[in-house]
Amino acid sequence: MNAPSNFDPNQPTVVQKYGGSSLADPAAIQRVADTVVERVQQGNKLVVVVSAMGGSTNALIELAGQISEHPKRRELDMLLSTGERVTMALLSMAIADRGIEAISFTGSQCGIITNDVHTDARIIDVRPVRVEDELARGRVVIVAGFQGMSYTREITTLGRGGSDTTALALAAALGADHCEIYSDVEGVFSADPRCVRDAKLLDQIGFGTLETLARGGAKVLHADAAAWARRAGIAFRARKTGSQETGTLVGVAGLEGIVAVSSSDQRRFLQPEHPLDGLHGCIVYSSDQGTVIDSQNLHGELPGIACKTLTAAGEDLLCDPKNLSQFLACVAPCQGWWATPFGLHARFDEHTDIAELTRRAHATLVV
């Protein structure tokens, strides 16, 4: 098919990602289609990465559990990758019904190449030749997030937050002018607004600070996706689906000082096999591949103790002893703490009121 007569190949390329809550049902998919068409009509080439419809991935996992107590990871990938394929096809249909040419691609069809770790693969290369060809024809390209193909031609999935990583990887490979991550929150806040009433929406934030918050439990972006954005240097905007607000720009220098706190009650504490100088109560695991700090995103199954954590992000926290002592005072008695280049993490036992600690840390530290 030839490009539309009014198509300009020099139009800016925009990569958008929509999460499952934004695509929860047919009505939500129709609303996203309206948003995509409006953006095309403003003079942009669009690549849209989609997650599975809200709740469908968990439903597929439960379905697998009804069939097998220990399903093979390869077969889980074959099953779980279908969720995003449903969404991509439905959204492509909805856009086409509005008079805009669209085509859907799986992760493998759009050139997402991964390693061979089933259910938790990592992207090693992106070859978006077909995506570029369809953009040149004036079509909107819909991509199934969360999945790719290994170098041995096996279907793989990227683990939780994989659709975010798909969008950022495609934006980098395409040299996109803009990348936008849409979810059900307005952007990045200085704390979880559900437990901190005066949490502030941040206009901008740096890569490292966002990654620290994500590893501490902030849900605006998965930590692996935040790490990918930092390594690739891909600036993006975190926005709420359907909102007119501009959200948070991620990738600029960010704000000075201490900018935010986050918390999690789903971390695993792995007892250190040996002490590390300068790190107290550090989450550490030693293996043949080396020493890993921060167990939240370790790959594979490792033994650990469930614990709660609180994270404060900002460079001033680590260079100003007063700020450090304030943080430790407001979260005491913590069981242990450890530092990263952009923030400080504290660990607590299972009986700790993590929401109250989050409010206290926010009131004490966030400027």
Region roles according to the model:
Residues I95, L213, A229, D277-L279, ...:
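Hydrophobic alpha-helix position signal
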